Amino acid sequence: MKFKQDKDMLLFTSLHPILIMIYADLNWYAKSRHFVELTITDTISTLAEDKKLNRTSSSHRECRAIDIRTEQADLDPYIISDLIKYINSKPEYKRFHYLSNGGQKRLAYFHVGNAPHIH
C-alpha cells in the first residue's frame, strides 16, 4: 500500500474498519487485474482542513472516506472506470452504499477536486 503523506499512513488504521476492508479489496483488484498499485492521498481530516479544501461532506472527518490518486500515467480512464465499477457493483458492499447529493447510491466515484482522484 502506498501513501502520499506519512500522516495518512499513520491515520489509516483509525479509519472505519469496513472502509479498510473495502480498500484492501480494491487495492488487491487493482494489482491483480491491472498491475497497478494505488496511492492513498487523503484519509482523516479536521474541519479546518475541510474548509480549506472547500469540502461539503463530513465523510473524511467521520473516518468514512479516503482519496485515491488517479493521475499517474498507469491509471488510464478505463482502469479508473473499472475500479469504480468493481467496488460499486459488489453485492456484499451494497449495504454500505451512501446516497449522493445527486441521488445516486454508491461507494466510490471519480472526482476532480484539488486533483483528480477516486473518493
Annotate the PLM regions.
Residues 1-25:
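Extracytoplasmic cell-surface/polysaccharide-interacting catalytic and binding patches
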Residues 1-4, 46, 72-74, 113:
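General structural signal for secondary-structure boundaries
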Residues 6-8, 25, 37, 42, ...:
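Acidic-enriched, low-complexity/disordered segments with a strong bias for Aspartate over Glutamate
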Residues 10-12, 34-41, 89-94:
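N-terminal start-of-chain detector that recognizes signal peptides
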Residues 17-57:
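Extended, low-complexity, intrinsically disordered C-terminal regulatory tails
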